[in-house]
A protein has these predicted regions:
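Entry beta-strands of beta-propeller and related beta-repeat scaffolds
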Residues: 1, 69-74, 134-138
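Eukaryote-skewed repeat-based solenoidal scaffolds used as protein-protein interaction platforms
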Residues: 1-60
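Hydrophobic, aliphatic-enriched repeat segments that assemble into extended interaction scaffolds
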Residues: 1-4, 64-66, 129
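Residue-level signature of beta-propeller blades and closely related beta-rich strand-turn architectures
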Residues: 3-7, 77-80, 141-144
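Beta-propeller blade signature
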Residues: 10-33, 85-105, 149-167
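Loop/turn-rich, solvent-exposed surfaces of beta-rich toroidal or solenoidal domains
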Residues: 49-118, 126
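Blade-level signature of beta-propeller repeat domains, shared across WD40, Kelch, NHL, RCC1
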Residues: 125-168
Length: 168
């Protein structure tokens, strides 16, 4: 989750990822009943991880782990603060653990992960799926009058410190 939209605030430049123990979550499993959805679950997450992205609109749209590159990909909508470049894609090292440190503006100490790279790649907010071997299905959203749609394309991740995507 995140606090976003208010460009006057200085404490809304992080996304917050809640971490839960997958094994512990099993005791809350229930069959889906659309007429009476359950709301069971743990009282608290195991951890809150703050991810510095700068201000974004609507927070994280897609978070995907790519086992081939061992990176997390985070797709967001551009933010509105002029102090940030507001890239739509962030990369995080999947092998680095978050570290406790003071977050900007408030000085409060939290678990924090910093991005290892960014990309100006403008798709992925409405869908991204790692397929392995550097291949991804990535959504291109659009609108035709009142109808919204998404086309899915196959992409290859480029190599390097700050990878990008090439359509296959």
């Amino acid at each position: 989750y995140g606090i976003y939209g208010d460009v006057a605030r200085g404490d809304n430049d992080y996304q917050i990822i809640l971490r839960y123990d997958r094994e512990e979550l099993k005791k809350y499993e229930r069959p889906l009943d659309q007429k009476a959805p359950h709301q069971s679950g743990p009282e608290q997450p195991d951890a809150k991880i703050f991810v510095f992205t700068g201000n974004t609109v609507y927070g994280v749209q897609n978070l995907e782990y790519d086992a081939a590159s061992q990176k997390w990909l985070m797709a967001v909508y551009h933010g509105q603060k002029s102090t940030f470049s507001n890239p739509p894609m962030f990369w995080f090292d999947g092998q680095k653990a978050p570290v406790e440190k003071a977050i900007k503006e408030s000085g409060e100490r939290h678990l924090v992960i910093e991005p290892v790279g960014t990309s100006a790649f403008t798709y992925g907010q409405t869908g991204i799926c790692a397929l392995g071997e550097g291949l991804f299905y990535i959504s291109h959203d659009g609108a035709d009058g009142e109808k919204q749609f998404s086309d899915i394309y196959l992409y290859q991740m480029t190599d390097g410190e700050n990878p990008d995507f090439q359509r296959v």
